[in-house]
Amino acid sequence: GQPAWLVGHSLGGFLSLMCAARHPALGGHGIKGVLLLDSPVLGGWRARALELAKRTQLVGSISPGKISRKRRNAWPDAQAAFDHFAHKKAFARWEPQVLRDYIAHGTHDETIAQGTRRVLSFERDVETAIYNTLPHNLDRLLRRHPLQAPVAFIGGTESQEMKQVGMAMTHRLVGKNHPGRLLMVEGSHLFPMERPQETAAAIERALQSLAR
């Protein structure tokens, strides 16, 4: 094996960061760097506010879980599922082939008394539980377990998540002397699905910067 790059989008970025902090010698070979894709790191008063929302069970009213728990999960067929998502604001900007892949691998046919229908391949309750348990303690975790690998960040130019969370802690992690480690791609929080080719190119540039 070889040292690994950890690359994650949204929650995947947070998990990559947590893994790098807690397990710097991952697999016995170490971690070369962490690349966050629109995963602005929460710290300060915003982190404490999220912690309070989780403690008081109010997090479900402010997290994406308020949408996922009511997400439609069945359609007559795959084309109907595609058409449904294609007209949803969050999915309408996706590259069509990416959305087709989402339907192909994120849904499946289910046999029912009337024949077959297309259903989600994941449970809404699990998705909602994930949203409602977003980490609020990253700042404290990183103080206890300082990162031993460099960090880079790629964000969407129209990302609401970046605006809501702020970028102060992310800037501290990336550092001021590495402009190649803070990149932007046109699009929303879901820019990897909206502009996959541009995202792949940005990932390559960011990893090259981390390797220097």
Give the ranges of each region predicted by the language model.
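Short aromatic-enriched loop/helix-cap "lid" or pocket-rim segments at secondary-structure transitions
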Residues: 45-50, 165-167, 195-196
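Conserved loop-alpha-helix segment in the C-terminal half of the alpha/beta-hydrolase fold
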Residues: 142-187
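C-terminal alpha-helix
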Residues: 202-210
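Catalytic histidine-centered segment of alpha/beta-hydrolase-like enzymes
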Residues: 184-200
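Alpha/beta-hydrolase
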Residues: 67-158
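Active-site loop signature of alpha/beta-hydrolase-fold enzymes
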Residues: 42, 161, 190
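Short, flexible helix-coil linker/hinge segments at the edges of structured domains or between repeats
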Residues: 39-67
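Conserved hydrolase catalytic core segment
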Residues: 2-49
